[in-house]
């Protein structure tokens, strides 16, 4: 872990950074760096497919071996034929090094994309810029890599680790904030709703705010650092996750109610639009 605890000087520029897949680093100011789409497409289309074929060969060989052990009294010609098939499968397995070659290429692609995105982002920074990131559980990413071969979480964790290491090495300040609800809450009216996000799109079910989902998360990550009330809630409840989520949910609910009171015209307009849409159907 490379977290720095930094003060909040008013003169500093603050970047909220969402670490994702479609866009590797999406900033609160709308800029974005890198993408994992091509890398993950290669993994799913080439690496997974290749290992699937490799596994199929091994399963066929295993079935023949099991059949031979179970049936001791097979005719000689049948037994010889099955042994020949098993030998052929064994030779195919020994020659099938493509899965591991493709897997190595995947890691090379992954490392290059992360390196390029990190260097591009860090090169764009002023010295007084503070980078705000989500606090990610790197252990879970490593577990994901070992257990189920799904590399999207692993890639995201690796990218953020590399970014923190580089920021630390280059002398830039950064801080991590708890990630709860940063992808679900509306940065405009504070409406907290899972339905706000649909893939890469964000559309608030309350005020109608819409935008890129990763950009929206970057905005919320920045707010999680700058908003003193949010910071206090997170700090006071960092060892009790259930209470933390309850406090955050309550805080956003109160802010949303206040927003509705201060901007009633937005909700009247939204209600009229919904009624017109309903009558049209």
Which sequence ranges carry the predicted segments?
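Positively charged, helix-rich recognition surfaces that bind polyanionic ligands
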Residues: 1-281
């Amino acid at each position: 872990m490379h977290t720095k605890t930094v003060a909040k000087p008013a003169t500093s520029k603050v970047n909220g950074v969402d670490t994702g897949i479609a866009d590797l680093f999406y900033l609160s100011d709308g800029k974005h760096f890198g993408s994992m789409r091509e890398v993950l497409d290669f993994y799913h289309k080439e690496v997974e497919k290749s290992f699937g074929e490799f596994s199929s060969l091994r399963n066929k060989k295993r079935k023949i071996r099991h059949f031979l052990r179970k049936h001791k009294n097979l005719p000689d010609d049948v037994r010889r034929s099955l042994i020949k098939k098993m030998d052929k499968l064994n030779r195919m397995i020994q020659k099938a090094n493509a899965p591991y070659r493709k897997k190595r290429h995947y890691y090379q692609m992954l490392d290059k994309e992360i390196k390029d995105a990190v260097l591009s982002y860090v090169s764009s920074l002023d010295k007084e810029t503070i980078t705000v990131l989500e606090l990610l559980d790197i252990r879970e990413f490593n577990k994901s890599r070992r257990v189920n071969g799904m590399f999207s979480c692993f890639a995201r964790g690796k990218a953020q680790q590399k970014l923190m290491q580089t920021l630390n090495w280059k002398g830039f300040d950064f801080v991590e904030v708890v990630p709860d609800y940063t992808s679900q809450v509306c940065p405009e009216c504070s409406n907290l709703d899972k339905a706000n996000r649909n893939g890469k799109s964000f559309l608030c079910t309350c005020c109608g705010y819409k935008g890129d989902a990763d950009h929206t998360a970057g905005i919320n990550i920045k707010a999680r650092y700058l908003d003193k009330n949010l910071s206090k809630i997170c700090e006071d409840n960092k060892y009790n996750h259930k209470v933390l989520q309850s406090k955050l949910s309550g805080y956003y609910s109160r802010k949303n109610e206040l927003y509705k009171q201060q901007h009633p015209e937005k909700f009247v307009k939204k209600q009229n639009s919904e009624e017109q849409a309903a009558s049209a159907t």
